[in-house]
């Protein structure tokens, strides 16, 4: 947290935050405890998922290391709400967000905004050849080779990026209107539905635990999982406290 304060000072007060993929839940709660102890808060946090967003992501990492985006986002959102910090820190979400529904789904469970790269990469010609790290991208998107860069015709691709951006936001606006909403900030977990079986559906607000403001501070936590993770978390280390079962 002191490094965040240092960056903020050196940048003349510019917004400072960090992006991460959630690993062990107590590790982020340890960061949250450090926020409380130092009084130093990031301006924003971007939660990424384990889904693997770049063509250079190792196969061993993709889908195997870290927590999926929506699970991680919900945990971070709940932790900040439970500590009365959510209104002081903005939350972004990233990880295989392409369509308007992808955007709406993360806004509904806690994100203030969504980062999207994949769709725009497709718009400029990415074919997912998974050679980003080789400098030999066949479509000229991820390369420093002047010859290969010629494959990317900027005026043509710029129009495609513009069209994708405009139409994605238009689709999001249409989804909001269909739900009777006027602004993305009105989306909540009650607007998402999951089919559990052929005869049962549930709202996300019924499927997941949502902490109330200050709940972690009072100790009266709705859900044993959050209570246990909070007890395990340490402000001075990512190593957990051992919690003895009652």
Labelled PLM ranges:
Residues 1-149:
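Glycine-rich phosphate/ribose-binding loops and adjacent secondary-structure elements
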């Amino acid at each position: 947290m002191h490094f965040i304060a240092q960056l903020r000072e050196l940048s003349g007060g510019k917004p400072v935050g960090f992006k991460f993929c959630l690993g062990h839940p107590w590790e982020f709660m340890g960061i949250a405890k450090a926020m409380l102890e130092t009084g130093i808060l990031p301006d924003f946090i971007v939660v990424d998922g384990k889904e693997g967003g770049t063509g250079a992501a190792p196969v061993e990492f993709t889908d195997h290391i870290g927590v999926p985006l929506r699970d991680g986002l919900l945990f971070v959102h709940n932790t900040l709400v439970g500590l009365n910090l959510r209104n002081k820190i903005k939350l972004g979400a990233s990880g295989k967000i392409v369509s308007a529904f992808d955007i709406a789904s993360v806004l509904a469970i806690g994100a203030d905004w969504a980062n999207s790269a994949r769709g725009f990469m497709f718009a400029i010609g990415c074919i997912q050849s998974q050679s980003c790290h080789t400098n030999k991208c066949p479509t000229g998107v991820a390369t420093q080779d002047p010859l290969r860069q010629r494959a990317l015709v900027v005026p043509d691709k710029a129009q495609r990026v513009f069209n994708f951006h405009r139409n994605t936001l238009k689709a999001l606006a249409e989804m909001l209107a269909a739900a009777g909403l006027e602004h993305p900030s009105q989306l909540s977990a009650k607007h998402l539905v999951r089919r559990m079986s052929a005869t049962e559906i549930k709202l996300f607000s019924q499927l997941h635990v949502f902490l109330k403001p200050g709940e972690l501070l009072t100790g009266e936590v709705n859900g044993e999982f959050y209570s246990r993770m909070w007890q395990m978390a340490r402000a001075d280390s990512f190593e957990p406290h051992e919690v003895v079962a009652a």
